């Protein structure tokens, strides 16, 4: 898979997630955004929300269920805009906003 295909899968994933969850943004991050991907790379996706709901433990499995409809290579995480979170900071700096 190349970067263009990963971006297209991320777009499809964003559309599917948006139908079930109020999201603020979605980023493709990791090896595809840093151009270090290989044939075995997964597709790291950060789903940004305003607030983690009380149903965090329901929202996370939802993201994984939706991924099965798009691609099993997708590895989603759910985050808030917390500049003190190193993962969020890395996603915003190096990720591709979808």
Question: At which residue positions do the language-model features occur?
Answer:
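Catalytic core of pol beta-like nucleotidyltransferases
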Residues: 1-25, 33-39, 50-98
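Short glycine- and acidic-residue-rich catalytic loops of nucleotidyl-transferase/cyclase enzymes
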Residues: 41-43
